């Protein structure tokens, strides 16, 4: 089966498409889209199905209309994987779906399945995962060596727009107590120098390292003693949860129902439900090398049930069941 992904963003093209390859499909990734690019790919690659994903430079209004027109003219099924739910369902995902008019939608948010169904949109749940060819345990790298690391964007403007967002609570539980107690945390990602209006703390400039290439993240996960995993929702996991564990990192994350549903705290990762508990856990595990190593190993084993190959196989099963594929 030939699958065409109309996408260019590193956080999207190095995950699910590789899972379909691992599942035995022939996969092509478009790169930046134009009418010429899409027309050429459809005629030369001759895909059986076309995927679009997430929120990127390839999901602008203009490109969404172009994708819809081109794929429908080729009489091919168009699938959209919604990775911005539930936060941006109304501001981004639904308007995009209305322009793309996909034949089927997968969403990372279970609670949105019923909502989309009531709107007449064919939909199923499909979570993030990780690709073991991208997120794997590497040798520690001196450039990224640190006691406590965070790989994430801060999103200060979005969080000021959504002051009740669970991500803020996660940040206040995991990061604020450490910074307030001058316990160094090394940050990779954008916007950490602008987070003070949201969290009420200023992160010291030497702790902030800026943008990190997506495919280099596992070097941090393999080199930091503790990785802080920020959660966006109570009922779903962030993408980096899977990626940190897949890279053999020692993960300290927020104590949420979904974390507990999928993993065993204290065995495969550790969780905190308060700033005080975060301080206690960090102080304990920074001294407990053997415990950290054991938990990391169990975590890497547990997360192997969440590879993108397995996600791809399940997507194909659903699409066949829904008669999108034959």
What name fits each language-model region?
Residues 269-275, 284-289:
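Conserved acidic donor-binding segment of nucleotide-sugar-dependent glycosyltransferases
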Residues 308-326:
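C-terminal alpha-helical cap of glycosyltransferases
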Residues 71-84:
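Active-site proximal beta-strand in glycosyltransferases
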Residues 89-104, 175:
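Membrane-proximal helix-turn-helix segments that form the acceptor-binding/catalytic region
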Residues 1-41, 45, 54-66, 104-242, ...:
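Nucleotide-sugar donor-binding catalytic core of glycosyltransferases
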Residues 291-305:
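A short, well-ordered alpha-helix in the C-terminal region of glycosyltransferases
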């Amino acid at each position: 089966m030939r699958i065409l992904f109309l996408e260019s963003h590193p956080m999207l093209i190095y995950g699910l498409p590789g899972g379909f390859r691992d599942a035995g499909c022939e996969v092509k990734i478009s790169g930046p889209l134009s009418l010429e690019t899409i027309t050429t790919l459809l005629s030369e690659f001759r895909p059986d199905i076309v995927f679009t994903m997430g929120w990127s430079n390839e999901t602008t209004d203009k490109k969404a209309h172009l994708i819809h027109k081109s794929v429908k003219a080729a009489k091919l099924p168009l699938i959209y994987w919604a990775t911005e739910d539930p936060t941006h369902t109304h501001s981004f995902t639904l308007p995009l779906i209305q322009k793309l008019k996909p034949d089927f939608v997968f969403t990372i948010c279970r609670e949105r399945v019923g909502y989309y169904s009531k709107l007449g949109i064919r939909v199923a749940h499909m979570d993030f995962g990780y690709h073991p060819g991208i997120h794997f345990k590497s040798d520690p790298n001196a450039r990224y060596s640190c006691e406590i690391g965070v790989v994430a964007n801060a999103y200060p403007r979005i969080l000021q727009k959504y002051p009740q967002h669970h991500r803020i609570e996660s940040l206040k539980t995991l990061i604020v107590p450490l910074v307030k107690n001058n316990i160094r945390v090394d940050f990779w990602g954008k916007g950490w120098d602008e987070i003070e209006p949201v969290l009420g703390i200023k992160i010291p400039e030497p702790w902030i390292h800026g943008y990190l290439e997506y495919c280099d993240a596992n070097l941090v996960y393999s080199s930091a003693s503790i990785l802080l995993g920020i959660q966006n929702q109570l009922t779903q996991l962030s993408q980096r949860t899977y990626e940190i564990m897949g890279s053999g990192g020692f993960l300290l994350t927020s104590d949420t129902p979904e974390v507990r549903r999928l993993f065993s705290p204290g065995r495969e990762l550790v969780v905190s439900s308060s700033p005080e508990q975060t301080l206690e856990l960090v102080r304990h595990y920074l001294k407990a090398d053997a415990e950290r190593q054991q938990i990391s190993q169990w975590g890497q084993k547990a997360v192997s049930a969440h590879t993108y190959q397995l996600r791809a196989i399940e997507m194909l099963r659903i699409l066949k069941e829904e008669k999108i594929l034959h």
